[in-house]
Amino acid sequence: MLVDFSQASLWLTLACITFNPTAWNVAARREHHTRWLTNLCGGAKQGCYAIAIAIFSMGIIRDALYNQALNDQPTLSLLDNALVRLVAGLLFISGMIFVATSTYALGITGTFLGDYFGILMSERVTGFPFNVLENPMYVGSTMSFL
């Protein structure tokens, strides 16, 4: 069996993967229409930093659950070799470079939904990694999770 669907960790991880972006997008859209988080936190930048902390924290929980779910799943002996581990390591490192450099280029408010708070960048970011990939955060995250 390739996937053990009886593992609770699998279902909890899938729920978390689904819930997290839904929650922060609902919160951000509500912020855009009502400024509830701006008012609660005393300013747009503070509200954006608050949602950034929530998103980052939820991501850490998701990653821990994902790791546990993987550990609870059966392994495929075909993939248990040095070449696969090397490729996996290179994908992870490359993916993290794309994610980290994207975050650096965009800053906290550019990365974590600042536009919903009315915080806009003065110009489009075109340097690395955006000159290599159109969506380096999505591609980098996918590479890291493979």
Language-model regions, residue ranges each:
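Membrane-anchoring alpha-helices and their flanking helix-loop junctions
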Residues: 1-132, 139-146
